[in-house]
Amino acid sequence: MVLIVDNYDSFVFNVAQILEEAGAAYCVRKNDDHSILDGGFDCAIISPGPSVPDESGLLMRFVEKFSGGKLLGICLGHQAICEFFGAKLRRITPAHGAQSELTDIDFSDPLWRGVSDFRVGRYHSWSVERQTLPPRLRVLALADGEIMAVRLSGTKTYGLQFHPESFLTPAGGQMLRNWLDL
């Protein structure tokens, strides 16, 4: 069972659709629903959202409890994972509905298996400050100099600043299936 932590963002339904197409059982719970802290799931996806991690319900408590397990943070979820481990966020010129090409990709990571199109959709106005990223978080890809993907070393915990569930990320479904298959 995949738990989707909904940060009050409509893109959560795009994530759910990809999971459904992949044949994965899932449930969706809001970020302020205390049941997200109870466990009872195999893995979790933290959805995008309109805020910052500290202002998003129980999100940081959730990351504290379940990081190191099989966890995928998308946009706000990515920022929460990075911030929990010590990185700082900074406001950037908004990239809402922008498509970028991933660069500096760590092709050794299984997240990219079978992916040949590295265009990604971006919808964010905050970014992780690269110089504050702790060594435990390995950068897997950049775009326009911004961190787009990280992995917590030795775990199945990932953060994606871009939106794999967006139509602007043609290979996003493959990326999510690769994560599910870990």
State each model region's role.
Residues 1-65, 74-76, 170-171, 177-182:
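N-terminal beta1-alpha1 cap of cysteine-dependent amidohydrolase-like domains
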Residues 4, 121-122, 161:
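Short beta-strand segments
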Residues 20, 35-40, 81-84, 130-134, ...:
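Short loop/helix-cap segments at secondary-structure boundaries that form the rim of catalytic
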Residues 25-28, 89, 139:
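Generic structural signal for residues in well-ordered beta-strands
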Residues 41-109, 119, 176:
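Cysteine-nucleophile active-site neighborhood
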Residues 75, 124, 163:
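Histidine-centered divalent metal-coordination motifs
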Residues 109-154:
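Catalytic beta-strand/loop cores that center a nucleophilic Ser/Cys/Thr
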Residues 136-151, 156-182:
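C-terminal and late-domain segments of enzyme folds
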